[in-house]
Design a protein with these regions (language model features):
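Short, structured segments at the rim of ligand-binding sites
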Residues: 2-429
Length: 429
């Protein structure tokens, strides 16, 4: 168990077959909070982020800021960054734990003229190269070199605006280039940009601090560099993947769950598929109510894609809900080639699954039964919890630390919905 209780190891013990009922308020999005914490490096004054959940990746981000000389801490449900980093080197151990650590390089480079890190970590769901980040930074005037496991970025003449076209709409690369361009000299036009709502959230934060950004949320973003940015208080957007998780849990286990505080429009493709499967889905501006009291049906083949398509992170969650459908489904993830490592766990529950390349095929299973499985990664681990909720008997999901990277109080919140789930710490965890 990590200090402060942020990242716990151990197992989830789940007795399935109980329908879910109740309300879940969706917290701030991890995939928004992490780039926002990186963006605080650009700010000359304090930054307060509201209602930030106690996630392992947030804890790692605070370690990165403090390790580079910044002053950052939690205050109740908020995160306060009182002072930006003063040194250019990111803590190697923390950086290696989290894919998003690469986002901290651009603002360090912009503020201090240099950034040093190790190649980032995160879930092993496929190749996630940083070449788009680096080629974009080079276009803005950065120089990049590798020394062993270390990546060193410098900008001897500062960063200057440029016209950049991404060959793929990478969310991380788009965020990196927004962070770099916000205080670069001159204008930057970014074409082929990612359109995810987290991009628009980052741009809204930067603009609140004094940046000039137009077009965030579209494929073309224009940035007028500003010499300095101020601090601000900001409430990050809600987590559409966490909302998707509880929606899929309700579909798998049955019952009625109300999700509040998260715009259904941000995860509409998933809700549409659940409706096609036989769930009742009622949506308001910030609320979705998912009900499932009858049988689920397969929907043929669906695909993930870049926003506004079905999110890649939602694919294993949706697959877990499809395990008990009365006809076939398949999901192809066009983003990551190893998204369905959790398929082995699905099979242990009795799911009739088969992987072929990036596609998971799901045939009707008469029933799911209890099993002992291992959480392979963040979303795959959550998907196995969902499968256990639908299975008959008592299951064990082992090595759940990866789940803590994206879900706060997961067992407690599921328990409040009526799930029978506890956490058991293993000796030495």
């Amino acid at each position: 168990m990590r200090n402060g209780g942020i990242c716990m190891a151990g197992d989830f013990i789940i007795t399935g077959g109980r329908p879910l009922s109740g309300t879940v308020r969706i917290p701030a999005a991890k995939n928004s909070v992490l780039p926002l914490l990186a963006a605080t490096i650009l700010c000359s004054g304090p930054v307060r982020l509201r209602n930030v959940p106690p996630l392992a990746d947030v804890d790692t981000s605070l370690r990165l800021l403090r390790g580079a000389g910044g002053a950052a801490c939690r205050q109740g449900g908020d995160v306060l960054v009182e002072r930006a980093p003063t040194t250019c080197r990111l803590d190697a151990e923390a950086a290696a734990q989290m894919r998003a650590s690469i986002l901290f390089c651009a603002p360090l480079l912009a503020r201090l003229g240099r950034a040093e890190t190790v190649l980032p970590g995160g879930c092993r769901i496929g190749a996630r190269p940083v070449d788009l980040h680096l080629s974009g930074l080079k276009a803005l005037g950065a120089q990049c070199r590798e020394e062993g496991e270390r990546l060193i970025l410098t900008a001897p003449s500062g960063l200057r605006g440029a016209d950049i076209t991404l060959r793929f709409p990478s969310v991380g690369a788009t965020e990196t280039l927004l962070l770099a361009a916000a205080t670069a000299q001159g204008s930057t036009t970014l074409r082929g940009a990612a359109r995810e709502p987290e991009i628009a959230d980052l741009a809204a934060f930067l603009c609140r601090c004094g940046a000039s950004i137009r077009g965030a949320g579209t494929s073309t973003i224009r940035v007028e560099g500003r010499r300095t940015l101020a601090g601000c208080t900001f409430a990050p957007m809600a987590d559409r993947i966490v909302a998707s998780t509880y929606a899929c849990a309700c579909a798998a286990a049955g019952g009625r769950v109300e999700l509040t505080g998260c715009a259904p429009a941000t995860y509409a493709p998933l809700l549409e598929i659940l409706a096609q499967m036989g769930c009742s889905v009622e949506c308001g501006p910030e609320t979705a109510v998912i009900s499932r009291f009858g049988a689920l049906h397969g929907v043929g083949k669906v695909f993930t894609g870049v926003y506004p398509a079905l999110a890649t992170d939602a694919a294993p969650l949706l697959a877990a809900a499809m395990l008990t459908a009365k006809s076939e489904s398949s999901i192809e993830d066009v983003i990551f080639e190893r998204r369905f490592v959790c398929a082995e766990g699905f099979a242990a529950f009795g799911g009739r699954v088969e992987t072929a390349g990036r596609t998971l095929h799901i045939a009707p299973a008469r029933r799911l039964s209890a099993a002992e499985v291992r959480a392979p990664d963040l979303r795959g681990g959550a998907a196995l919890v969902i499968a256990a909720l639908a299975a008959e008997g008592t299951s064990r999901v082992r090595e759940t630390g990866s789940i803590d990277r994206g879900y706060a109080d997961f067992a407690r919140k599921l328990g409040q919905l009526g799930a029978q789930i506890t956490r058991e710490m293993r000796p030495g965890a």
